[in-house]
């Protein structure tokens, strides 16, 4: 039984390139990693983890997407979106607004109306207290 659980965890493991704080999720960081493009199977796009964050101002959007701000313990925040997950455990964790979450995703350009920004595109969410 324990061996099966370990194998299942290993199959679901995500590769993470760096653990960062929301304050580090900047356009400058995104642009520095964009120099490594083009991305594909042999050169995956960098994945980042945020630890101990809270999903603030979560909104369920059309299509089951969840938009929020991920806020770290120091109050620094990054805009974030999780695609088609509102009905899944990851989406429910974001929509609950609970803190202490670990989030994995990728930085993406968020350019609108002449403003160049960045958003965190969420791939997975976990609550370490539930492991």
Regions from the PLM with identified roles:
Residues 1-131:
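Acidic, two-metal ion nucleic-acid-processing modules in DNA metabolism proteins
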């Amino acid at each position: 039984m324990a061996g099966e659980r370990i194998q299942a965890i290993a199959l679901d493991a995500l590769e993470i390139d760096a653990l960062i704080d929301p304050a580090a999720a900047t356009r400058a960081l995104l642009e520095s990693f964009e120099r490594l493009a083009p991305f594909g199977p042999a050169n995956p796009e960098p994945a980042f983890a945020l630890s101990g964050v809270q999903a603030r101002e979560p909104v369920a959007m059309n299509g089951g997407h969840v938009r929020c701000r991920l806020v770290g313990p120091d109050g620094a925040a990054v805009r974030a979106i999780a695609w088609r997950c509102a009905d899944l455990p990851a989406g429910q964790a974001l929509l609950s607004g609970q803190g202490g979450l670990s989030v994995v995703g990728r930085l993406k350009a968020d350019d609108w109306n002449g403003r160049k920004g960045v958003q965190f595109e969420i791939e997975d969410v976990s609550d370490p207290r539930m492991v």
